[in-house]
């Protein structure tokens, strides 16, 4: 399912970041978790392995009914996986909707590409 048998005999310290994330998904499957939280799946992972991870997430959702809560900055990756999308900043929901809706939301753009939410709030209070 996850095509990780080729790394079965390798020490954990010798496999790549993406391979470690695939092993983590495999461990999730072993305990049959129905809700899975993934933090920064794409961090340090090459695009090929990220696509493999994304394919596995989609299959686990469709075939086994797993629900995923994914924390990720790569909106292209998220677009493959999630609908709806919720964007948070400073511990609060900033926007929610389709990937296109949140990518074009002025608050999201300002928080992540502009001066940042904290600075904007400080300026408004002054």
Name what the model sees in each region.
Residues 51-63:
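Helical segment within the ABC ATPase nucleotide-binding domain
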Residues 11-15:
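Conserved ABC ATPase signature
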Residues 78-80:
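A short, surface-exposed alpha-helical micro-motif characterized by mixed small hydrophobic
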Residues 1-7, 34, 55-58:
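Conserved ABC ATPase "signature" region
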Residues 72-73:
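H-loop/switch region of ABC-family ATPase nucleotide-binding domains
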Residues 40-41:
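Walker B catalytic motif
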